[in-house]
């Protein structure tokens, strides 16, 4: 288990730096099929964790979840996440469609996309 590097702390602005310094990253090659990352509280599990330069969209996405956990607390976040998934699964009848319909996932994908766009604009051409 590792902490975010200084490059990652500088790059990932999707959560407050004070919270980012408390994040732990754990490589977990055996995540569920189709999943590259998962977050529980301030621990981020990544299928691959070989790049530590602050350039990975999956890390930005998972760090949004760290912030969501922090803002709501563990139990409220999990209750809302799972109820969002259950409602979406009832509606869509397929796991993948239900996953993408979870409000917390939509927010994390949107913020990671915005983060990547800001990063692209800031980098010299």
Question: Where in the sequence are the language-model features?
Answer:
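Short pre-active-site segment immediately N-terminal to the catalytic Zn-binding motif
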Residues: 36-39, 43-60, 70, 98-101
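Generic hydrophobic/packing signal
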Residues: 46, 64, 112-114
């Amino acid at each position: 288990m590792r902490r975010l590097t200084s490059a990652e702390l500088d790059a990932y602005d999707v959560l407050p730096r004070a919270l980012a310094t408390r994040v732990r990253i754990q490589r977990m090659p055996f995540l569920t099929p189709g999943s590259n990352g998962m977050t529980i509280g301030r621990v981020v599990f990544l299928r691959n964790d070989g790049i530590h330069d602050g350039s990975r969209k999956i890390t930005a996405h998972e760090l949004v979840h760290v912030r969501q956990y922090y803002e709501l607390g563990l139990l409220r976040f999990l209750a809302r996440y799972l109820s969002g998934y259950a409602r979406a699964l009832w509606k869509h009848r397929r796991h993948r469609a239900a996953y993408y319909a979870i409000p917390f996932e939509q927010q994390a994908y949107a913020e990671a996309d915005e983060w990547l766009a800001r990063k692209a604009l800031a980098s010299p051409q």
